[in-house]
Amino acid sequence: MAEEYFGMNVRAESPIRTAHAMLEGLRKKPSTLAFGTISVSGINYLSMVMAMKLGGVEYRKLKTVTFVSGSESTLALLGGHIDAVNTGLGNMAEHLKAGKIRTLAIGSPSRMPEPFSDVPTWRELNINVVASGWRGVMGARGLTPAQVKFWEIALRRVMETPEWKQDLTDNYWVSNTVDAQEARKRWDAEYLESQSLLTDLGITRAK
């Protein structure tokens, strides 16, 4: 139903001005910066790892601090307790407007609207990463095709409501409608990709 893309952020006073500068420093010493995350198995962390990997960084040596929520990691960044955080744009928009943070790159397929319109995508920086925390609805096992169709129609109607469209705007989400079959294909593909990366990081065991 929606895609939530993630941005790499540092404090406004950070000496790191660009994503390229961040990658250059981390290639020399991967443990230089402390990154905040809410889960080392979540897509916000894994998308960051993918960017670092493609940027030539020894990503297994990154310094990571785990928090219980995106807002907590954001506060830690603002307070100077961590150096960077890769998080949803909705967590950072007001801080960017206030001049408190700098967003270096976003993992979206194209540039996002204000206040992020001047922020390059990872792809623009020749780092081929597009990843989102997508929003959808899961049904119970055993739903009949007719029941699945009922919910597909109902949820499409929800997506046409002013309330849903306002949620998209407020959270910097991007609307994306796929049916149950396509959603399952995406789920399976992302599961395999995540499993491979988590195994590479030593977080899970290979099956």
Ranges and model annotations:
Residues 18, 80-81, 100, 126, ...:
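Conserved functional loop/turn residues at catalytic and ligand-binding sites
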Residues 1-72, 122, 134-167:
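Hinge/capping helix and adjacent helix->loop/strand transition within the periplasmic-binding protein
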Residues 45, 49-56, 83-117, 195:
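A ligand-binding cleft/hinge motif common to bilobed small-molecule-binding domains
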Residues 64-75, 88-91, 181:
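Short helix-initiation/N-cap motifs at beta->coil->alpha
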Residues 111-129:
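Small-residue (glycine/proline)-centered packing/hinge motifs flanked by hydrophobic/aromatic residues
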Residues 103, 145-207:
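An extracytoplasmic/periplasmic, membrane-proximal ligand-sensing/linker region
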